[in-house]
From Swiss-Prot:
NCBIfam families: rplS_bact. Pfam families: Ribosomal_L19. Keywords: Ribonucleoprotein, Ribosomal protein. SUPFAM superfamilies: Translation proteins SH3-like domain. Belongs to the bacterial ribosomal protein bL19 family. PANTHER family: LARGE RIBOSOMAL SUBUNIT PROTEIN BL19M, RIBOSOMAL PROTEIN L19. It comes from Chlorobium phaeobacteroides (strain BS1). Transmembrane segments: none annotated. This is Large ribosomal subunit protein bL19. GO terms for cellular component: cytosolic large ribosomal subunit. InterPro entries: Ribosomal_bL19, Ribosomal_bL19_CS, Ribosomal_bL19_sf, Translation_prot_SH3-like_sf. GO terms for biological process: translation. GO terms for molecular function: structural constituent of ribosome. The keyword Nucleotide-binding does not apply.
Amino acid sequence: MDQFIQLVEASQVRNDLPDIHPGDTVKLQLKVIEGEKERLQAFEGVIISDKGMGTSKTITVRKISNGVGVERIIPLCSPNIESITVLRKGKTRRAKLSYLRKRTGKAALKVKERKVFTPSK
C-alpha cells in the first residue's frame, strides 16, 4: 500500500518549479477565479518557512502591504500556481524566519543576499 501511495505522489509532484529556500524573495503568479473569469494575481514577498515534502509541501510567503504584514500559505503542488520567479536569493541560518514578523518597515523584509557562484569558462 505504501508503494502505491508513493507512486501516485510521484506522478503529481511538479518539476517545473525553481529551487527555493527560506529567505528567498519570490514573485508568484497565482490563478484567481472570479465567477466565470480567470485572471493572474501577483504576490511578491519573502519565504519565511517551508514545510512538508512531496505533494504536501507548502511555503509561507510574507509581504508588507500598506504597512500591514500579509502572509500566504501556498501548497507547491497546487494547479493554481502559474509560475514562481526567484527575485533574490537570501542567506539565512534558520529554517523558519518567524523573527521577521516582529520587525516593521524596511527591516521586516531585510535578509542578507546569498552570493551565487557560476563557474567561469
